[in-house]
C-alpha cells in the first residue's frame, strides 16, 4: 500500500461522504471531546480551542435536553437530574443539587429533592424521598438566602460568607469550599434553587461558569415550570370540584349540622389527596346550667382549667367522624370520644381548637410538642406520617370543629397548596352553618308562635270584672273607675275581704284546699304576700297584684291534677316552709317574694302530660326546649306575664333587683324537674350535715347566707318539697290527691296507647290500677323520704311533713299488703284448678296413652 499523505486522505473523504460522516460522528462525539480535554496526557493536534469544543458540547446537550423536555411519562425530577449531570460536567463541578421551595404554616422553606448529582451518578441514588428530606427555613444557609433574594450567588469561599451553614456538611461529612447557587423563579414565586458545589481544578466558579450555569438552567426552568403549571391546574381543578360538590350537598341538608358536614365531606373525599381525615365536632355550649355549677362553687369539683376556644368555651369534642380512604373505604363515627383516642391523644386538634391556627406538620411522630402515636393506630396497620389540621369557623368566628388530614397520597408532606384547598373546604363548611342556624332560628320562631297562639287561645289575663270580684272598689267606694281610687283605699278594701290566715290554716303543713273554692284560693294567695310583708315594702300596686294572681289562676288548665289547686298548694307550702319552718331567716324579703311568686307559677299552663310524652309526641314544646321541657315552658310563661306592665308585680324594683328575681325564678321553676332532683340532693345533704355540727343558730345562718350557691341549693330542694307536699298531707287528703295524680297518669297512658300506639309504663297503665298502693310505697321510699327526712334534720319545725309522710306510707303499705295477699290467694286457687284439670285429663286419657294437643288420631 502506498504512502498515505494529507492530500490523499482529503481526496478519499471527499469522494466517500457517507464514510466521512460515520467516522466523524463516531470520533467527535461530545463524550470523546470531553475526555480528550480532561486527560491532559492525550496529545491533540488541532487548532480547535477548549471554548470551541465546549460550545460543541453545549449544542449537543441542548439538543438532548430539548428531547428530555418534550418526553412524556417521566417525572420532572428525572429531567432535572439529566440536566444536573450535564451541568456538573460542563462546569467541572464536583456535584450539583436541587432544593425545592414551598411553604408550610405560612412560612417559606427549602427542602432537598436531588442531592450530590455527578456526571455518572444514578437517579435513584440522588433522589431524596419525602421521609429523608432535609428541610430548613430561608434564613439558614446560602441556598435559603438565594431563595429569599431571588438572585444568583457565586461564593468563592463559603467560610467567608455569613449566610453559609455547615449543617449539611456535618450530616454527610462532605466539605464545601465554594458554590454557585441560582433560584428558579416563576413570576414572584421561587420554585427551586439549583446549586453547584466545589469547582474541580480551580478555586472558584468563574464568570463564564455563571453564564453557562444561567443559560443551561433555562431548560431546568422550563421543566419545573411545566410541572408547576400542571400541578397548579390540578390544584384549581380539585378546588373547584370541592366547592361545587360541597355547595351541592350543604344545601341538601339544612336541619342538622352533623349530617350537613358528613354529606359534603364524604362527597369530596376523592379530591382531598390524603389517606385519611377526621372531623372533630365541638360542643357549642358557652355557659353551664346553674345546677352544674353548684358542685364547682361548693368546692366539690375542681374548676375547669383545660384549654378553651377563643370565645371562651371548654374544648370538648362530642363526636369524631373518621374517614378511611386507604385500602377499603370506611367511615367510623365515635360519639363522646375518650381523651386517649388516637385522633385526640396527640393534642393537635385541641391546640387548633384553642388557638384557631392552621397546623401543617411533616414527620409528625418525631414532633416534640405533640405526642402522635408512633405505631399503627388501629387494626389496619396504618401509621401517621404527615398531618394538616385546620379549624372550622362559622360566620360568627366561633370554632365549631377541627378537620385533620393525614398522609398525602404521594408520600410528600402537605404544602401551601394543600392548605389552600383544605382551608377553602373548611371555610365553606363553616359559612354554610349560617343555613342551619337560620333554619333553627326560623324553626324556633315558628314553634314560639304556635305556643303563643295556643296560650292566647286557651288563656287570657284577668278581665276588669274578674278583678272587681276580689277588689270590690265599686261596691265599697262607689267608684266606677279604679284609677280614681287611692292606693291606701284599695289596700284597705282588699285586706278587709281577704281570709284570716290562721283560721284558713295557711300557716299549717296540714293545710287542705278542699274546703275552699278556686276563687277563694286566689284571695288566700294574695293574703300570703301581705303576710310576708312585701306588698308595702316593694310598693306592689294591689290592682296589679290582684290581676297577676287571677291571671296565674287562669293560666292553669283544667287538667286532673296539675291545675290551679296544685299550683296554690305549692305556693302555700313554700310560704309555710319560710314562715312556720323558719327557713325565711336565710333569705332576704326580695328573695322570699320571688320564691313565693315562682312557687305559684311553677306549673302554669301544664298540659296534664309529662316531659317524656312531649318528646315522644314531638310537640312544639319539645322542639323548642331541649331539656326540662315543661319546666322551661312554665318559666317562659311566667316571664311573659311579667313583661306586661299591668301584670308585673315587680315593676317598682330597680334593674338589679329585677334581674335577681328573674334568676331566682329560673332556679326555682327549673328545679321542679325531678330529673334534676338526684343531682342536687347530695349537695343539700352536705349542707344539712354541716349545719348540724354548728353550735349556734347564728353560725348556721352565716354559713348559708354568705354563699349564694348554698341558698340556691336549699331553695331548689324547697321547691321539690313543695311540689311533692301532697304526699305529706293527712291521709284523708292524701288518698284523694293520689287518686287525682293517678287519674292524670292513666289519661296520659291512654294517649300513649291510642295516639302514639305505644304500651305505657305500669304507673300510667289504667289496666294496672290495682298496683297503685305498691307504686305509692315505692315512690315514697325512692323519692320522697330523703327530702323530708333531711329537711326535718335541717329544721325541727318541718318534722310534721316527715310524720305525715310516714303515716301515709303505713296506710299505702297496708293496702299494698292486702293486694298482695289477695293476689296470692288468687294465684294459689288458679294453681289448684290447673292441677285438678291436668289430673282429670290424665284419668280420662287411659293411663299413659297421651293424646296429641294438635292432632286427632283416627
Curated annotation (Swiss-Prot):
Cofactor: a divalent metal cation
Active-site residues annotated for this sequence: 562 (proton donor)
Biased composition (Basic and acidic residues): 830-852
Catalytic activity reported: 3',5'-cyclic GMP + H2O = GMP + H(+)
GO (cellular component) term, any one: plasma membrane
Binding site for a divalent metal cation 1: 566, 602-603, 723
One Pfam family in the UniProt entry: PDEase_I
PDEase domain: residues covered: 486-819
Residues with a covalently attached lipid (S-geranylgeranyl cysteine): 855
Name of the protein described by the UniProt record: Cone cGMP-specific 3',5'-cyclic phosphodiesterase subunit alpha'
Organism of origin: Homo sapiens (Human)
